Amino acid sequence: MTLEKTTRMNYLFDFYQSLLTAKQKSYMSLYYLDDFSLGEIADEYEVSRQAVYDNIKRTEAMLEQYEEKLLLFKKFKERKELLKKMRELVADSAQTEEAEALIESLEKLD
């Protein structure tokens, strides 16, 4: 699993965990946040590794569907990028008009 995918899943889990069942939250938390292996999670819950794998894959797909519809992570990244640009512009105070335009763009995201 790539670091990029892990980071994305961690963000999606943060944004959408309230929409998951207790079991889904637990499996995802153990797998992504606590870095448990499938076998360790299976032992903890007394189920097969395949059951854990299937649950995690289904939950990942659900998180991606939530993001596709709600776009919370996308908007978060856009806000983060706009804020970065704003900080750069504030450092160069000669470009206040561009800073105001970025602020307006940021306000429209919410």
Swiss-Prot record:
Which segments cross the bilayer?
Answer: none
This protein's source sits in the domain of life called Bacteria
Under the heading InterPro entries, the entry gives:
RNA_pol_sigma_r3/r4-like, UPF0122, UPF0122_fam_protein, WH-like_DNA-bd_sf
Family under the similarity heading: Belongs to the UPF0122 family.
Report the protein's function: Might take part in the signal recognition particle (SRP) pathway. This is inferred from the conservation of its genetic proximity to ftsY/ffh. May be a regulatory protein.
- Name recorded for this polypeptide: UPF0122 protein BPUM_1495
Q: What is the lineage of its organism?
A: Bacteria, Bacillati, Bacillota, Bacilli, Bacillales
